[in-house]
Amino acid sequence: MDRPAQFAGVRTDMDFNIIEEPQVFYCAPADDYLPDPEAVMITGITPQQALAKGVNEAEFARRIHEAFSVPGTCILGYNNIRFDDEVSRNIFYRSFYDPYAYSWQNGNSRWDLLDVMRACYALRPEGIIWPENEDGFPSFRLEHLTRANGVEHEHAHDAMSDVHATIAMAKLVKQAQPRLFDYLLQHRNKHKLNALIDVAEMTPLMHVSGMFGAARGNTSWVSPLAWHPDNKNAVIMCDLAGDMTPLLELNADELRERLYTRRDQLAADQAPVPIKLVHINKCPVLAPAKTLLPENADRLGIDRQACLDNLKVLRQHPEIREKVVALFAEAAPFTPNDDVDAKLYDGFFSDADKAAMRIIQQTKPQNLPALDLTFSDGRMKELLFRFRARNYPNTLDDAEQRRWLQHRQEVLNAERVQSYLLQLESLYNLHEGDKEKMALLKALFDYGKQLVG
C-alpha cells in the first residue's frame, strides 16, 4: 500500500463556497519505506521534500482525522472512494484511529465526484463539454475535464490544485444538471440505495461503474440477484447487457473460476461472467431503469430490448440465483499477507481494543514504552511497536532498535531494492531529455541509496 506524501483539503458549504482556510501539509516518509517512483513522477514531491516539510505519520493522521471527524462533514474527492479513502483508512489503522467511524458517525458521509461525472455524461450530458481520449471515448480525467470546460487547473496532481478543480467541476454539474446532482447527493446514503434494490422481483436498475468501460459510457442496466452471503453491504448484480450463457451453462465452481480470470486471458469462445458486486456503502450510482432514456441508451450503444430479454431469462431460471450465491459463499482467491501493515481488513477491532487505541492516542510519546496494555487482537502489539519505531524512534530501547533494524533489512531486502532500481531505470528511459523528470529520478536514486546505505 502506498503511503501519502501530502494532504490538501478545504471545507465548503453545500453550494461549494469555501468557508474555512485551506489545509495543506506533508507527511515525512518512514525509514522502512521506499516511495513509489510512479507516484513521485505524478506529484513531483520527492521524499527529500516530504522529509523537510513533513510531520510524522502519527501527526499527519491526527490532523486529517480531526478535519474528517467534524460532525456533518461530507468528504468529497475525485476517485477518493477507491483510492484516497483506502490510503486514509490505512494511515488511521496504523495510527490507532477507528478506520471507518469518521465516514459515518455524527451525521458524516462520503461521496465521489468521479462517478457523478460519469453519470452526468451517461444520463444528462447537456451543459458540460465532454473531452475525448485518443481512442475516441469520453475522458474522465480531472485535468481533461477542467481544460475542456475552461476551469483553471494549472498544476494537475498538485493536491490543492486538484481540490479547487474538484470544487469547480462539482459546481458546474450542480449548475448544469441540478436535479441529477441532488438525486445523486441524496443517494450517496446506503439506506436510500437499499430502498431501490428489489431482489425478489429482480427489478432492473441503471448503474454507472468504471468496470463497464468507456465504450458504453461506463453504464448498463443491471438486475439484483441476491445479497452477498457474508457482506450485508454488497448486492450481487447481473449486467443485463452481458451474455447470459455462462450463467445458464456453468456450475458455481466454474463460474467462480471464470469470474476471477482476467478478460484478456479468456479464450475467444469464453464469454465473461456478467456478474458484479455493488457495495451500497461505497456510493455507487444506482437509479430506476427508466432514468436511462432511449436516446441516451442509443448514444451509449446499450440495447434496452436485449437487456429486457435477458431479464426474462433470469426470471425463468431461478437456479441462476442459487449458483451466484454459492459462487460468493466461498471467498475470492487471495494471497495471505503476514505483514501487519497490510491487515486492515483482517477483522474489526473489539470495544476493549478500541479503548486501548484511545489510551495510545492520549499518551505522550515518551510515556508509550511504559504502557501496560492487554490486547485481544493479534495485530495490536506489532502495530504499536511499529508506530513507536516510525514516529518516535527515540522511545526504543537497544533491543527494540535492533528489532527495528532487522525489520528494515527484511523490508528493504535485495529483491525490493533491485525492483526499485529497475523501476527507476525504466522511468529514466521513458523520460530521457525531460529535465524535471530527470531531477525527480535523481532524487529518488539518492534517497534510496541513503536509506539502504
Task: Describe the residue ranges of each PLM region.
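Conserved, well-structured beta-alpha core segment at the onset of a catalytic domain
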Residues: 54-55, 63, 70, 451-453
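Short, glycine/acidic-rich hinge or "gate" loops at secondary-structure transitions
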Residues: 160, 179-191
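Long, charge-rich C-terminal accessory regions
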Residues: 229-407
